[in-house]
Curated annotation (Swiss-Prot):
GO aspect biological process, one term: defense response
Inducing or repressing factors: Upon contact with the plant pathogens fungus Fusarium solani, Pseudomonas syringae pv pisi, and the fungal elicitor chitosan.
Entry keywords, A to Z: Pathogenesis-related protein, Plant defense
Keyword check for Ubl conjugation: no
UniProt xrefs under Pfam families: Bet_v_1 (PF00407)
Identification of the protein by name: Disease resistance response protein Pi49
Length: 158
C-alpha cells in the first residue's frame, strides 16, 4: 500500500467558530442547500461523532453516485475535524481510502486559516494522478468557498 500526502491551507474572512459550524456542525443539512451537485448527506451508522458512517450522494457527469465518509474526530473546542472516504460508487479502484485532517484557527482581521492534510492510501504502489489531485482540490476548494459564501450572505448565521 502506498501513502501519498497533500497539504493545503486556505484563508477566509469568516470567523473560525462560524466557519466550523458551517463546515462541520451543520454541514449535513447546509451543504446540499448550497451545492446543487450534492443531493444529500445522511448518517448510515452512528450518532455523528467518531466512528459515524455518512453517505454523501451527488451527481457527477449526469450520474448519481455516492461516497461513504467515516468520521474519525470531531473536536469542537479545537475546531478540528478528521474523516476518511472509505468507499462508494465512483470511488477510484486504485484507492483504499482518502483521509482528511482539517483544523481551523484564527486568521488576520477576525477571519480564519484552514489547514488541511489529505492522505491517499492506495492499493499497491499506485499513486493518485495529477488529474485526480487537481480535481479533488478543486472540489474541496469549491465546497469551502460555497459554505464560506453562505456565511457571508447570511450575517445572522452563527
Amino acid at each position: 500500500m502506498g501513502v501519498f500526502n497533500v497539504e493545503d491551507e486556505i484563508t477566509s474572512v469568516v470567523a473560525p467558530a462560524i466557519l466550523y459550524k458551517a463546515l462541520v456542525t451543520d454541514a449535513d443539512n447546509l451543504t446540499p442547500k448550497v451545492i446543487d451537485a450534492i443531493k444529500s448527506i445522511e448518517i448510515v451508522e452512528g450518532n455523528g461523532g467518531a466512528g459515524t458512517i455518512k453517505k454523501l450522494t451527488f451527481v457527477e457527469d449526469g450520474e448519481t453516485k455516492h461516497v461513504l465518509h467515516k468520521v474519525e474526530l470531531v473536536d469542537v473546542a479545537n475546531l478540528a475535524y478528521n474523516y476518511s472516504i472509505v468507499g462508494g460508487v465512483g470511488f477510484p479502484d486504485t484507492v483504499e481510502k482518502i483521509s482528511f485532517e482539517a483544523k481551523l484557527s484564527a486568521g488576520p482581521n477576525g477571519g480564519s486559516i484552514a489547514k488541511l492534510s489529505v492522505k491517499y492510501f492506495t492499493k499497491g504502489d499506485a499513486a493518485p494522478s495529477e488529474e485526480q489531485l487537481k480535481t479533488d482540490k478543486a472540489k474541496g476548494d469549491g465546497l469551502f468557498k460555497a459554505l464560506e459564501g453562505y456565511c457571508l450572505a447570511h450575517p445572522d448565521y452563527n
